Swiss-Prot record:
Gene3D superfamilies: Aldolase class I (3.20.20.70). The active site is at 95 (proton donor). It catalyses: orotidine 5'-phosphate + H(+) = UMP + CO2. The keyword Lyase applies. Keywords: Decarboxylase, Lyase, Pyrimidine biosynthesis. InterPro entries: Aldolase_TIM (IPR013785), OMPdecase_AS (IPR018089), OMPdecase_type-2 (IPR011995), OMPdeCOase_dom (IPR001754), RibuloseP-bd_barrel (IPR011060). It comes from the Bacteria. The gene is pyrF. PROSITE patterns: OMPDECASE. It holds the Pfam family OMPdecase. This is Orotidine 5'-phosphate decarboxylase.
């Protein structure tokens, strides 16, 4: 099944636009897992089991695994999600961007080694740096557009031909880059006016929206700005607020409570 089909099915089946980010910080893992073999996998698996029926996607951040030499645990985690919850797509948050020959190997890493359903990429080096990902025709390619960090404005708001760079990225994604029909854009919840502008430009293209929860993005403003006519179109990501709702042995139950509340709050404003 193609990424966009998986995503649409998950929106409907779980009645959810919530994406849970899997960013396992060893310094914040529960004491019961500290020092145990495979602690990162065990933590993430418990979060996945507690929230899988509440989400439209999971988004592991590769750096949190690679910095701990835990790439094998990332492989194990994605394999587990696919086996236990085959209807939930996995987005590898890698934000790769390099020349075509190198990008071919990053694409193999994402889609062949890790078996992710989608990957985040940077458009800074242009279309040829994204083509190797798009060659995997069933896989999602989610392009950084208007990011949630404050420093994103340094480049994304520079003007070219009378409009900011982030709008040009959205236009190129709509008109030129989306050769597989599986492209999406990253637009931060911290900037709802820009979400609305991107939605206007790209139509029904899926948007990955980080920045709610710990980053303080407003859920109502985000949903109203980014929803499509049928009340979908978004993967609204929350990571830390869910993962670290508790650092005690009840961490998975606490994560479920926060995920459920977040999903239900999102759903208040979908229609």
């Amino acid at each position: 099944m193609r990424f966009t089909e998986q995503l649409a099915a998950a929106w409907q089946r779980n009645n959810s636009l919530l994406c849970v980010g899997l960013d396992p910080d060893p310094a914040r893992l529960p004491a019961s897992l500290t020092g145990t073999g495979g602690a990162i996998f065990s933590f993430c698996r418990a979060i996945v089991d507690a929230t899988a029926d509440l989400v439209c996607a999971f988004k592991p951040q590769i750096a949190y695994f690679a910095s701990q030499r835990a790439e094998d645990q990332l492989e194990q985690l994605i394999s587990y999600i696919h086996e236990a919850y085959p209807g939930v797509p996995v987005i590898l948050d890698a934000k790769r961007g390099d020349i075509g020959s190198t990008a071919e190997h990053y694409a193999k890493e994402a889609f062949e080694r890790y078996q992710a359903d989608a990957v985040t990429v940077s458009p800074y080096m242009g279309f040829d740096s994204m083509q190797p990902y798009l060659a995997h025709a069933d896989k999602g390619v989610i392009v950084l557009c208007r990011t949630s960090n404050a420093g994103g404005s340094d480049v994304q708001f520079l003007e070219t031909d009378g409009r900011p760079v982030y709008q040009v990225v959205a236009e190129r994604a709509r008109d030129v880059w989306n050769t597989s029909g599986q492209m999406g854009l990253v637009v931060g919840a911290t900037f709802p006016e820009e979400i609305a502008k991107v939605r206007e430009i790209v139509g029904d293209m899926p948007l990955l929206i980080p920045g709610v929860g710990a980053q303080g993005g407003d859920i109502e403003a985000t949903v109203r700005a980014g929803r499509t006519a049928d009340g979908t179109g978004m993967m609204i990501n929350s990571s830390r607020a869910i993962l670290y709702a508790s650092t005690d042995s009840d961490f998975a139950d606490a994560a479920r409570r926060v995920a459920l509340a977040t999903r239900d709050q999102i759903n208040q404003f979908r229609n």
